[in-house]
Amino acid sequence: SAAKKAAGDYPELDALFVRQLEQQEKAEAVFFRQPSLEDITAPFASLLGGLLEHAPKDDALESEYREGLVYAGRKLGQWVYLIDALDDLEKDAEKGRFNPLSGEGGPARRAEALRILEEAEDQIDAVFSLLPFYRDASILSNIIQLGLPDVRHKVEKGQTLRPL
């Protein structure tokens, strides 16, 4: 299968995915005892940051640029986790599935999630504005400056995202 081939070709990334998804499961298991959106998003944030850390090596991208890329990846992972939680809120409630934005304290956590999402968008934009892109800069800029906020606004209004 494609997953087995990828795991064989990239064992470090496979180990990262397995480790972070296990951490995500553990974080979700204790969430309602210690509700922290920072803690619940950390494993997925680490997964995306780690994925970008393994981006092809390029001398021009080393040192501070790679650190910035990893940081932006972590913020994007946090954003993806929270936007998915907001988007799936009703469906998760209907099916009795875990969602960090439901239950007691849910409305306050939803407001906090929206604040974190907007903050993450700003931080991703700030980091990407400092990175030296040699191609596709306008596409990335549109995704970061227009796409992410547009998705957040749609989900905030209750519009369900279409599956890809």
Predicted regions located by residue number:
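Divalent-cation-assisted or electrostatically stabilized phosphate/pyrophosphate-binding catalytic cores
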Residues: 1-43, 66-71, 92-133, 137, ...
